[in-house]
Amino acid sequence: MDIELSGGRLRYQEVGSGPPVVFVHGLLVNGDLWRKVVPVVAGAGYRCLVPDWPLGAHSVPMPRADLSPPGVAALIAEFLDRLDLRDVTLIANDTGGAITQLVMADHPARIGRVVLTPCDCFEAFFPSVFAPLPRFVRIPGATWLLVQALRLRALHRLPLTFGWVAKRNPPADVIDSYLMPSRISPEVRADLRRFVAGVHNRYTLAAASRLGDFDRPVLLAWAREEKLFPISLARRLAAVLPDARLELIEDSYTFVSEDQPQALARLVVNFLGATT
């Protein structure tokens, strides 16, 4: 399905019926990140909306969109407005969690509750291993070089690619769905560059200073073995948010929806059942 927003056309999938649940993935992945979780949540009686946000693995470029972190947060808010979604549950991961915190701080009206899985927050936007990326992509040709280098599957287990976000390699077709759009489309690559170049932790730090006003329930479903976003960050979020609880997921890195989808889905369904 497609929807026309002020910044361009956004592609999304919709599964199930009931109270709305909107999924927010991170950088260089798309809605396929949630493919093992959505059927369980939809089967429990929820309307799951799974957009491909313009973060580098989307198939429809958005050249007119403001792709700064606040701009993408506004895009999420516009998506909720255009579909007139109310009492929405946002479920976010990785970079998408940082953007979701901006939505919570600046556009909370339609949000009923939030699930944050391991994600950027506070000063860790990006985490230290990825901190050079905003400067790097400003070098002419650097984004092209980056996405072409990711052709080499041997690189996919390195910390700078998928090695520290997933304990288990996603299937080859899923990896291709993540990496092919920016490899073959200059317009998607330009979107990717614009977003990455605009990342700065001033956004997440500013959002964190306002999260104390977000009084709706928040589940922090964090990976115990998290390498990029240590549990200490989750505990800091829990201390800032008025109604948050932390649950730890075993045997997983950042992509808990990839490594432990059933465990995540159980936590989500139980949380929704207790708060909707």
Kindly give the residue locations of the regions a language model identified.
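Flexible "cap/lid" subdomain of the alpha/beta-hydrolase fold that forms the substrate-access gate
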Residues: 10, 27, 56-87, 91, ...
